Amino acid sequence: LAEAIAVQSGANGGQGRRAAQLSKADLQSRMVGEFPELQGIMGRYYASAMGEPGAVADAIDHAYMPRFAGDNIAPSQLAQVLAVAERLDNLAAGFGAGLKPSGNKDPFALRRNALGLGRTLIEGGLEVPLRRLLAYACGLVAIDLADVPVDRLLDAAADLAGKGVPVNAEAIDRKIASTYDAANADPKLIDELHGFVLERLRGYYAD
């Protein structure tokens, strides 16, 4: 998802994918386990220590922005891409699982995710249509590779091999995911999410 958004917005697709792969790795560390407020910050340090590009390391930290009401959005384009991808994934998965906010109950902070998503797109000047992003995210969330027919997996592997691409689980995953688009997402879910994000933005900018 991050790679696709990066490519569409003019950022580095490979770095977008790499940042997404590493974005939650620091949650497994003892440091973040003891001090949760350091998530992202420690991820940046760990990524830098591993020799990752500075843009990738910074994106892992800054993708959490805005962290609170009134906070700035992520400063770099790559971090904005990752911030958008993570919030899209959270919203699509949350609504897809029926975990919609109700009244004052929002245990998965989907309202905050929606506002952060909208603000990052607008204030970051990312020229990618919101509805298209939501459709793509919902389509990806609907994919369960365990349910993909074996012959389709074999076809994907054969196609990769024919193009000289190393055949591994990640490559097959990307090949299968690339065939899913808006047509695979529930239109009602897309409409609901679209309205949800716009509602949060109206309230924020009205204030």
Segment roles from a protein language model:
Residues L1-D207:
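Amphipathic alpha-helical "coupling" segments that flank catalytic cores
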